[in-house]
C-alpha cells in the first residue's frame, strides 16, 4: 500500500475520538525557525492515554502532551498559542531544549462542533483530493475544499502559489493555512528494479510518488505497491505527465540510453516553457547512469541545441557517492540526494 501523508494518523485519531465522545486535543507547530526540532506543520493528536504524530520530541513535546492532558481532564477548552524558545538563556518561553531554534505551538482542545472539519480533513488526506486546513483566532478550525479556497480571499493567493504550502500570520488575530496532502511530488521515469527499490525507500520520506514507464506488463511496475500512481505512457508525451512546480522531483532511469535521451530532451524543452519563479519547473531533475553514459547524454543534448546553462540543470550521475552497487544501495544513495535537494536552499 502507498504511504499516506504524514499527518493522516493525527486526523484519524482525532476523528475517531470525536465520534466516540472521547476528549482529544491537537498540538500543532505553526511557526519554526533555526534548529527547531519541530518544523512548521508538525502535529499531534493527544488523548488521556494515547498520541499520534509529533511536534518535535524531547522534553518540550513531553511538557505539551502533559499540558494537553491536564486541559482535557479539567474540561478547559480554551486554545493556547505560545512560542517555545530552545535556548537556556532565553528570558521567557524556554522549552527546556538547547537547539537554538524557536517554534510557535498551538494547543487546540477539540469540540464536538469540530467533527465536520476534522472528518473532511481526514478524507482529503486519505483520497489526496486537495483542499486547505485553516486555523484562526477568529474562525477556529475549518476545512476549505479546493474550489472554495480559490475564492476565499487570502487563501486564494496561497491556492495559486505553488510554493505556498503553509502560511502563518502571528499576533492576536493569528491565522494559519496549510495545503492538505503531500508537499513534495516525486516522479520516477522508468519502472525497473532500481525504480522499485527507490519507490520503497521514498515511501518513508513523505513524497507523493508517481512511476512511469513505456513498457506494458512490466513485472517490476505491476508489483510496485509503494507508488501512489503508476502509468504506462509514450515517452514522447512525458512533459505533459509532469506538471511544473518548486516541489517536483524527477528521476530518470528508463530501460536504456535512447529512452533516457528522449525523456531528457522533452523535459529540458519543457524547462524553457514552464519555469517557476525559481527559474526552473522542477526542484530536482536527475538521470541514473555511469559517468560515461551521462557524459554522452549531455553531448546529445548539446547537439539537440540545448545551452550549457540548460544542461547544467540536469544532475547526473545521481546519488551520493557511497559506492552503492545493488538496487537497494543505489536507491538509498539517490534518496539521500533527494533529501539534500529538499533541505538545501541553494541546491
Regions found by a protein language model. Name each.
Residues 1-214, 221-229, 245-249, 341, ...:
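Segments forming oxygen-rich coordination pockets for charged ligands
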Residues 193-195, 216-219, 237, 257-259:
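Short, catalytically relevant binding-site loops at active-site mouths
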Residues 199-201, 223-224, 243, 262-266, ...:
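Short amphipathic alpha-helical segments
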Residues 212, 249, 254, 260-301:
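ADP-ribose/adenylate-binding Rossmann-like module
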Residues 217-221, 293-296:
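Short, charged/polar "capping" segments at the starts of alpha-helices
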Residues 227-237:
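Glycine-rich, highly charged phosphate/nucleotide-binding loops
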Residues 235-246:
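Short amphipathic alpha-helix with an adjacent loop that forms part of the alpha/beta core around
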